[in-house]
């Protein structure tokens, strides 16, 4: 377990002064965000959350507003914080650094380790890091919050107080007796938002190690890292694979398996989303970097690269355009097909792009970078999230157990 650290020595300002200044700035920032200039973006978010009944509790409204302030991207790519700082020439360097640091908040489900003066020492069950946390409302904000309980909260750093964090927005407290439900929610959050896990550098390396081992097992089971199957057979084969993996794990830990039912062995572990289940074929690729991904109608695309004369047919042409356009699809499937069919790739793209001089070896990477800049703008991350020791214990009902959670985000092109 590591300690979360941000910033450097806070110099002449005391911690109390910094927290008080945070409270002042946050109040001004909220008022700025709720002004008419941002109404066209904030109001629809609140209305969507309220639903047709137009009911929204105060805590949820605060969370939505806080997320909007810190992380929502406006049309020009900036955040509300960016615009607030840009319009306030009266802010000194520390104020600016502090506000800009809030654009990278820590969302998590935290176990309360202990109280320490006005602070709580929290263990984030998602990234397995400890955070020394204050509230700008003072010690009173933590009244009724007890050791061993849990908080669902968002934290922002207190610049430049080393390793000091502040509650941002609403927080929800859950007693120790809620551990089972909390563990389930934390596992779901870790799986659906692996970037929260990877705030911890140790989890990144552990994730790569786990993904490499899982990919090796996948290749051994299927005989390769790429499959093209009908949807029903995809589910059947993947469930057989996961069952095989669970049985191998159980066989290696007979002391833990003896005398109790093994979770997941009697139930399907994998089910395709509806968008994929309606496809004619599913491409399954377990890449060394991009991890395990699923692609709708991949068989049709493979036919196109095998026979470039099909480029003139609208279904094939539309599908390739979709693969190039969609942000849910990485460059991986197009790279794979171009590499597998070097003798036809040039012809396919020349006809699609209407560029007779196009050569995949010279222009392919440039094309992908132009169509999918978001992919190249981010560091590669493992497709497997490694759950921390404490969350593993809670999920196992108090028994020490190491968990890995596969992140399987299917590439799902919209049907042309």
Model features per residue range: what roles?
Residues 118-123:
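Short aromatic-glycine-enriched beta-strand elements
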Residues 136-154:
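Short nucleic-acid-contacting surface segments enriched for D/E, G, S/T with interspersed K/R
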């Amino acid at each position: 377990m590591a300690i979360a650290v941000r910033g450097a020595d806070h110099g002449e300002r005391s911690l109390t002064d910094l927290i008080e200044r945070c409270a002042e700035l946050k109040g001004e920032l909220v008022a700025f965000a709720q002004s008419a200039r941002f109404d066209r973006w904030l109001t629809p978010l609140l209305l969507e959350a309220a639903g047709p009944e137009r009911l929204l509790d105060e805590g949820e409204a605060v969370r939505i507003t806080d997320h909007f302030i810190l992380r929502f991207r406006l049309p020009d790519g900036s955040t509300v914080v960016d615009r607030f700082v840009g319009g306030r020439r009266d802010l000194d360097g520390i104020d600016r650094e502090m506000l800009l640091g809030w654009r990278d908040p820590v969302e998590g489900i935290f176990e309360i380790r202990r109280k320490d003066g006005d602070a709580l020492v929290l263990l984030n069950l998602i990234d397995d890091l400890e955070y020394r946390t204050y509230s700008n409302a003072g010690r009173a904000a933590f009244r009724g919050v007890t050791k061993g309980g849990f908080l669902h909260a968002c934290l922002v750093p207190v610049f430049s107080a080393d390793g000091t964090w502040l509650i941002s927005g609403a927080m929800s407290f859950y007693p120790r007796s809620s551990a089972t439900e909390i563990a389930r929610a934390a596992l779901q959050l870790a799986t659906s938002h692996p970037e929260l896990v990877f705030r911890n550098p140790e989890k990144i390396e552990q994730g790569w190690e786990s993904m490499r081992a899982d990919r090796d097992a996948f290749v051994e089971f299927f005989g390769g890292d790429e499959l093209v199957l009908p949807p029903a057979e995809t589910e059947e084969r993947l469930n057989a694979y996961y069952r095989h993996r669970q049985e191998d794990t159980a066989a290696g830990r007979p002391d833990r398996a003896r005398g109790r039912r093994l979770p997941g062995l009697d139930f399907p572990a994998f089910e395709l989303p509806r968008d994929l289940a309606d496809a004619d074929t599913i491409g399954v690729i377990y890449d060394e970097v991009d991890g395990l991904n699923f692609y709708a109608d991949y068989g049709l695309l493979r036919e196109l690269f095998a026979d470039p004369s099909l480029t003139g047919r609208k279904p094939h042409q539309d599908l390739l355009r979709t693969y190039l356009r969609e942000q849910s699809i990485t460059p991986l499937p197009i790279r794979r097909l171009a590499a597998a069919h070097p003798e036809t790739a040039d012809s396919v793209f020349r006809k699609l792009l209407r560029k007779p001089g196009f050569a995949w070896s010279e222009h392919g990477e440039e094309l992908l970078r132009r169509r999918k800049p978001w992919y190249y703008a981010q560091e590669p991350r493992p497709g497997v999230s490694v759950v921390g020791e404490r969350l593993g214990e809670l999920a196992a009902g108090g028994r020490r157990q190491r968990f890995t959670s596969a992140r399987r985000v299917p590439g799902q092109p919209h049907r042309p």
